[in-house]
């Protein structure tokens, strides 16, 4: 899930996951507002921002997932947010960011309500190459480090209610990791 232009399709096309057969995605599914990406260990559904923004269409998609796989409709949700919404000429105002965040939160809540499961939600910040110095920073990393997550993974149980202090913990952990990596370069 993401906002228009977040780069979900680019992420799915260039993620390095093994594709068992030619043509990882089903372009025919685009007409339905989502594209299915087939990998050797799973399927990813790239939901268009039009469907995410339209509550009725999103509700219908969630219901289809629930009816197709009633015991486990999804394993997780991936929320893709571009850096361009946070920095630079195209950055959003605080009010607009809050509105976008609230809208995406409501969709994730609706999804979990319809499928009757609390699923892990991963947040990917895309378009890092738009950050000044990010490309040079990544070029200096070893191949092994480039394959690792540059971010924070919640140490809390999936069912634990969200706590606002997690954002501070995440920012501190990411900052600490970045400082350590810069010293190694």
Model-derived features with residue positions:
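Basic, amphipathic N-terminal segments
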Residues: 1-185
